[in-house]
């Protein structure tokens, strides 16, 4: 029905629209044996993907997620968008944050405010912001932070870049200056604990004792 490119590969973003067209033109094979569908990370699915899901699985659903944790603004959904796909749904908001300390939550609120968020009073170290004049100075600063981490007694450090391309480039730079730096990419077959350089997309679901966010400026995160 659909013509692929010469390499016979379809883009991920095109799959749901093509599936929706296929269902509209040829009908859909309803998966009636599924009685209740649970969807996690709701913010990572686009509205058209939810339309396809509704066509294939007309059963009751529980959809969970956090719109603030979306890593792809061009292929994501807010709670309001999901309500348009499931018009009879009921929305329940859980506003108390248990995962992060009060200090981390307060910093996050300065970056992206959420007036409904209620942080718990679990305190920890204040996040530090280090200004650097250029990329070379930043690399040196990260190497020093890695050295401090190794003397801290903690076991996991995540160096989280915006994109996988940035993560690969930074990992190569750091590996010149220090040992035991692992790159976690879409090609990785396993997650290695310790000091990990990765992208925001790959870091979803992972937890670290300490985190470094390089290139955290308006030019990179615009």
Residues covered by each model-derived region:
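Conserved helicase motor core of SF1/SF2 NTP-dependent helicases
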Residues: 23, 27-36, 43-222
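Coupling/switch/interface segments within P-loop NTPase motor domains and analogous charged loops
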Residues: 1-16
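Short, hydrophobic/amphipathic alpha-helical patches that form generic packing surfaces
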Residues: 12-27
């Amino acid at each position: 029905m659909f013509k692929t490119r010469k390499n016979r590969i379809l883009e991920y973003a095109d799959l749901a629209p093509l599936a929706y067209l296929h269902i509209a033109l040829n009908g859909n094979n309803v998966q009636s044996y599924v009685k209740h569908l649970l969807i996690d990370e709701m913010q990572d699915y686009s509205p058209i993907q939810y339309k396809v899901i509704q066509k294939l699985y007309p059963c009751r659903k529980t959809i969970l997620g956090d719109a603030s944790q979306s890593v792809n603004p061009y292929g994501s959904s807010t709670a309001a968008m999901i309500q348009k796909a499931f018009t009879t749904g009921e929305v329940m908001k859980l506003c108390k944050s248990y995962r992060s300390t009060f200090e981390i939550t307060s910093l996050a609120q300065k970056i992206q405010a959420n007036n409904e968020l209620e942080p718990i009073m679990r305190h920890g170290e204040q996040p530090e912001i280090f200004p650097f004049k250029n990329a070379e100075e930043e690399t040196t600063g990260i190497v020093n932070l890695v050295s401090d981490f190794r003397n801290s007694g903690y076991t996991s450090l995540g160096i989280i870049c915006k994109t996988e391309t940035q993560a690969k480039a930074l990992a190569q730079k750091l590996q010149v200056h220090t040992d035991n730096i692992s790159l976690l990419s879409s090609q990785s077959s396993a997650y290695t604990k310790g000091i990990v350089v990765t992208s925001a997309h790959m870091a979803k679901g992972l937890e670290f004792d300490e985190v470094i966010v390089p290139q955290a400026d308006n030019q990179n995160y615009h």
